[in-house]
Amino acid sequence: MAKRTANNIKPGELNLKEKLVHINRTAKVVKGGKRFGFNAIVVVGDKEGHVGFGLGKANEVQDAIAKGVEDGKKNVIKVPIVKGTIPHQIIARYGSAKVMMKPATPGTGLIAGGAVRAVLEMAGIHDILAKSLGSSNPHNVVKAAISGLESISDAYDVAERRSKSLKEVFES
């Protein structure tokens, strides 16, 4: 399966919005006391099927967020959306974080929590049931959600892989 990676998506042509998922403060003990640094996880997306995430580190919060946004624009993927939801159920893992996503009927809404919700909102998915299992570490949950969305196959992908027409795929 060919992955929908940032190689064929030009982020400059997209109207990307950003959503902050998590900020972490780190401390380095030096001779004069503690020196604080920050890292930020940011999800970017156009709410029309493109989503990516980035991690930024800096001595100031705003700089960390800006670096996260720039990093996120480099990692944008295309997500197949069918009638406001995903084509099929997926379970994705990254480390000990596990994310389960199920398609939902129109009108259900976005039922997800925490970091998964931010990813799905930025992707533009309106009707979905999602659950984060295992680790609640926002880094790993975001990476699991993105890898799950990246692994989704729509009917066109399946037809291409099987060297069949779209009609033959639906009949089999």
Curated annotation (Swiss-Prot):
Ranges where the S5 DRBM domain occurs:
16-79
> Which Pfam families does this UniProt record tie to the protein?
Ribosomal_S5, Ribosomal_S5_C
Q: Which InterPro entries match?
A: Ribosomal_Su5_D2-typ_SF, Ribosomal_uS5, Ribosomal_uS5_bac-type, Ribosomal_uS5_C, Ribosomal_uS5_N, Ribosomal_uS5_N_CS, Ribsml_uS5_D2-typ_fold_subgr
Q: Name one GO biological process term.
A: translation
The alphabetical list of record keywords is: Ribonucleoprotein, Ribosomal protein, RNA-binding, rRNA-binding
UniProt GO MF annotations: rRNA binding; structural constituent of ribosome
The organism's place on the tree of life at top rank: Bacteria
GO CC annotation terms, alphabetical: small ribosomal subunit
Extract the coiled-coil ranges from the record.
Answer: none
NCBIfam families given for it? rpsE_bact (TIGR01021)
**Subunit structure, as described in the record:** Part of the 30S ribosomal subunit. Contacts proteins S4 and S8.
Its UniProt domain note says: The N-terminal domain interacts with the head of the 30S subunit; the C-terminal domain interacts with the body and contacts protein S4. The interaction surface between S4 and S5 is involved in control of translational fidelity.
Q: What does this protein do?
A: With S4 and S12 plays an important role in translational accuracy.
Protein name in UniProt: Small ribosomal subunit protein uS5
Q: In which organism is this protein found?
A: Chlorobium phaeobacteroides (strain BS1)
Gene that this polypeptide is encoded by: rpsE
